[in-house]
Design a protein with these regions (language model features):
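Structural motif
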Residues: 35-46, 79-89, 121-130
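Repeated scaffold domains used in trafficking and secretory/extracellular systems
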Residues: 2-27, 31, 55-69, 74, ...
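Short loop/turn segments that connect beta-strands within beta-propeller blades
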Residues: 91-94
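Short, charge-rich amphipathic segments
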Residues: 22-26, 43, 49
Length: 133
């Protein structure tokens, strides 16, 4: 298992060996589960300091850590690889919120976080996480 210290806003990609990623005093652990026909490994994830298994699987690509608390990840229901949904995870508290769509292109802008799906053109700008559930 690879050990990574994440940096804010820098996408992380992990391989089939899995990874333990540390970020601002918290950790998230990824364990390989499967790889779909199109590639890109999928992992189960756990927050070891909270002893919490996350109830979804996470693609091991384009993992983006934000602020001191959050991970933005591409997720799927356990046992599947589609449909993909972006979820914002507070890795310190074990809480998460679905963004109800898949956003594969993320950029940090002056007015917030711009999330875009390059395939269907949908765009979401997050200025705060206060209203996410």
């Amino acid at each position: 298992m690879e050990f990574i210290i994440a940096e804010e806003g820098i996408p992380q990609n992990i391989g089939c060996q899995g990874a333990l990623i540390a970020y601002y005093g918290s950790e998230i652990e990824f364990h390989y589960e499967t790889v779909p026909l199109h590639g890109d490994e999928i992992f189960s994830a756990k927050l070891p300091l909270l002893e919490l298994e996350l109830p979804f699987w996470i693609y091991g690509r384009n993992l983006i850590f934000l602020d001191a608390y959050y991970l933005l990840a591409e997720t799927v229901k356990i046992g599947t690889w589609d449909p993909i949904t972006s979820i914002l995870i507070n890795i310190h508290m074990g809480k998460y919120a679905s963004l109800d769509h898949w956003y594969n292109n993320i950029s940090i802008e002056q007015d917030g976080l711009e999330l875009k799906n390059d395939y269907d053109g949908q765009v979401l700008t997050l200025k705060t996480v206060d209203n996410l559930h």
